[in-house]
């Protein structure tokens, strides 16, 4: 049984991954900001395996430290960290973008990943093992119109993942980055601030990736032999060639 910590576990890729690993009887630490969602997930998953839910905002470094430095003994030895929390806010030109949107993306996508990792990595070093999965994006490989700051945050995730592999090379800790293209989740609804019609149009006319597709990939990456590290995966829907070229019918 492995102990797996997942940030952003209340929806989308995080939730799909939590359910997949629960069915494999892993011990789960599920983190998110919405207590009612955490309660719903806990009620479902606790029937299958041991689960601990933690409500905190990854962008609040004091809260991150307080919560993760005081884990119950049963959950204190973390084998796998899945840095999934993050989102996009707005789709505007750089001259018209909202500073609050920029802060939200930088705080969650970059700082949040770093704050959580900074607490967990020393624990992994002590046990001389561990696996960090950073959820990046196709947006970390290219830049698309009006994607400016979101793309910048995902380029940062790519750089951080590479830096982690260098810094942790002698520790026995694996670092993997998974970079999806378009995945049909609440992502666009959050980006467009509840404009459901606009969000739904993002996924019309083609088959987008599903959260379960990414959960399957995470499972594959984690279950490789100890000498194998899948460092980097880019996965797109068949209909998607780049961030802006999508074969819609």
PLM feature spans:
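Conserved glycine-rich Rossmann-like NAD(P)H-binding loop of the short-chain dehydrogenase/reductase
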Residues: 24-40
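C-terminal helical subdomain
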Residues: 177-178, 197-243
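Conserved glycine-rich cofactor-binding loop
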Residues: 10-12
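Substrate-binding pocket helix/loop in short-chain dehydrogenase/reductase
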Residues: 92-94, 101-106
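Residue(s) in the substrate-gating loop at a strand-loop-helix junction
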Residues: 137
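Active-site helix of classical SDR
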Residues: 117, 153
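The beta1-alpha1 cofactor-binding region of Rossmann-like NAD(H)/NADP(H)-dependent oxidoreductases
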Residues: 36, 55-66, 99
